[in-house]
Amino acid sequence: MKRKIAVSLTTFWTILWLVPGVFANDFDHSKFDQVLKSYVDEKGLVDYNGIGENQQFSLYLQSLQDAKVEELSRNGQLAFWINAYNAVTIDKVIQKKPKKSVRETGFPGLWTSTKFFTSPEHIVANRQLSPDDIEHEILRKKFKDPRIHFAIICASRGCPPLPRVAYTEANVQTRLEEETKSYLNSNRGTRINRSKNTLYVSKLFDWFSEDFIQKSGSTIEFMRPYLDEEVRHFLDGKPKISYLKYDWALNAQAPLKGE
């Protein structure tokens, strides 16, 4: 009898250990959630001036600094780093005040600089990180989930619209599915040109092709389950695939104050 109880307890604790998040604390993203609901419009355009004056956003950034991410479940960590990328990017726009694009070089009309993304200016989880650090060294390397490319927002009109809700441990998988499907069926994600028998797809599938190939064997096979029936049917005719020009224009509702 004692042996059966011991075995049962061992099984019980083993199951609990394997279930994601049983012992993990969820990080509080409610302040960021409220900011997104208040300052992002239905098109995903951002009121950077309003966010810059919002105390809740400042408090959220502070909370990211000493976060113990290792105590979160895998989904909790994924949600944390997506939100951290988006929050850091928003704050960099507020601090840098680009006029038309985060890739401005100082030469009118020339948008080629990557310094905005590569310069580590924020403390997140006790590390000084840049947006590129979060994207390439953490999200891509650790999670190997190409859907993150439709969740992290580069403050530009070519990237997916910034959602009006923060990611959480509970919603991250559902939200990733929704954002991927939404982007791929928008004009930013895919466009059909029947006269040229060409499907134009987002430049994201060129830049990060290895991520999609690793996941699904090819970029098209990754896309297929998310596409509307019209686009899937067009793909059956084996059209030419070309890439859309990426729009690096700032995703701001209005010019930033203090420019």
Kindly label every feature range from the protein language model.
Residues 26-259:
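Interaction/scaffold regions that mediate signaling and macromolecular assembly across diverse proteins
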Residues 1-4:
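Positively charged n-region of N-terminal signal peptides that target proteins for export
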Residues 8-21:
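Bacterial N-terminal signal peptides
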